[in-house]
């Protein structure tokens, strides 16, 4: 929804502040195939580039 950076969820979420629906300090993401422990994963260029929590659209994955 407008103004939200992440899905509020529960207070136990280490990435997203449930009271504000904003990412916690130091977090880059709260969910997604390329989100690992609140950080963008950079496993390889075809799946996770380190720039987003989502896989890139490159013809192979989307």
From Swiss-Prot:
It holds the Pfam family Disintegrin. Inhibits ADP- (IC(50)=63 nM) and collagen-induced (IC(50)=53 nM) aggregation of human platelets. In vitro, inhibits adhesion of endothelial cells to vitronectin, type-I collagen and, to a lower degree, fibronectin and laminin. The keyword Nucleotide-binding does not apply. It is found in: Secreted. This is Disintegrin atropoimin. Keywords: Cell adhesion impairing toxin, Disulfide bond, Hemostasis impairing toxin, Platelet aggregation inhibiting toxin, Secreted, Toxin. It comes from Metlapilcoatlus mexicanus. Monomer. The keyword Cell wall biogenesis/degradation does not apply. Belongs to the venom metalloproteinase (M12B) family. P-II subfamily. P-IIa sub-subfamily. Expressed by the venom gland. SUPFAM superfamilies: Blood coagulation inhibitor (disintegrin). The disintegrin belongs to the medium disintegrin subfamily. GO terms for molecular function: toxin activity. Its main location: secreted. One of its GO terms (cellular component) is extracellular region.
């Amino acid at each position: 929804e407008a103004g939200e950076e992440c899905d509020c969820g529960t207070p136990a979420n280490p990435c997203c502040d449930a009271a504000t629906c904003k990412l916690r300090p130091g977090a880059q993401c709260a969910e997604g195939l390329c989100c690992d422990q609140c950080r963008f994963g950079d496993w390889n260029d075809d799946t996770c580039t380190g720039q987003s929590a989502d896989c890139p659209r490159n013809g192979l994955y989307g």
